[in-house]
Swiss-Prot record:
Originating species: Borreliella burgdorferi (strain ATCC 35210 / DSM 4680 / CIP 102532 / B31)
GO biological process assignments: proton motive force-driven plasma membrane ATP synthesis
The protein's role, per its UniProt record: Produces ATP from ADP in the presence of a proton gradient across the membrane.
This protein's name: V-type ATP synthase subunit D
InterPro entries: V_ATPase_D
Record bears the keyword NAD: no
Gene3D superfamilies (UniProt xref): 1.10.287.3240
Pfam families: ATP-synt_D
Keywords attached to this entry: ATP synthesis, Hydrogen ion transport, Ion transport, Transport
UniProt family annotation: Belongs to the V-ATPase D subunit family.
Molecular function as annotated in GO: ATP binding; proton-transporting ATP synthase activity, rotational mechanism; proton-transporting ATPase activity, rotational mechanism
NCBIfam families, alphabetized: PRK02195.1, V_ATPase_subD
């Protein structure tokens, strides 16, 4: 931070900066609050989705155990692409899950167990939940990063920039006040000296 000059120009500069800091601080505080609320909301969504995943996997285990033969689902289900959208939250672009596109893999259903179709449907749900959880985690990471940056800025404004500007204004005001008082005193002394000089010359 540059050293302040005890001048009227610097006093105006400090007052302008203080005004700007006070105007900008509420915006930062609001952004911090919005980010916090959104993080809490997404973390709750993540917990709910995670519980859903656990229950589904338990149900799948129970369901698969009913059948003695194993089936190579990997060759039947292959993700082609995950379609995502983007949403702006308090200035942060976060990914939003949209859909999953699968490779078009064709097999002869005559030679597959009757329960495979149902199994594929369930596994697609499992895959989707996995993808959604990863995207929710990414959302939380992005928003947390911005929340930390915004919190640092709020602290900087509240604890450094605004107090420093106020202290500088006070310091300059005191100095200029002292200078003005000194000028008045010098003026009175000069006037008194002039009167004495005029009297002595008579």
């Amino acid at each position: 931070m540059s050293k302040i000059k005890l001048t009227k120009n610097d006093l105006k500069k400090q007052k302008d900066e203080l005004k700007m800091f006070k105007r900008y601080l509420p915006t930062l505080q609001l952004k911090k609050q919005q980010l916090y609320m959104e993080i809490v909301k997404i973390e709750n969504s993540y917990k709910i989705k995670n519980l859903e995943q656990q229950k589904l996997k338990e149900n799948i285990s129970n369901w698969i155990s009913l059948f003695s033969e194993k089936f190579p689902f990997e060759s039947w289900i292959q993700v082609k692409t995950v379609v995502k959208k983007s949403l702006n939250i308090a200035g942060v672009a976060i990914p939003i899950f949209d859909s999953i596109e699968y490779e078009d893999i064709r097999h002869d259903l005559l030679f597959t167990p009757y329960w495979v179709d149902k199994g594929i449907e369930i596994l697609k749900v499992v895959i989707q939940i996995d993808v959604e959880l990863k995207i929710l985690k990414k959302q939380i990471d992005l928003l947390l990063r911005e929340f930390r940056i915004t919190s640092q800025r709020v602290n900087l404004f509240e604890k450094v920039m605004i107090p420093t500007a106020k202290a500088n204004i006070k310091k300059i005001n005191i100095y200029l006040g002292d200078q003005q008082t000194a000028a008045v005193v010098r003026g009175k002394i000069a006037k008194s000296s002039l009167i004495k000089k005029n009297r002595n010359s008579l």
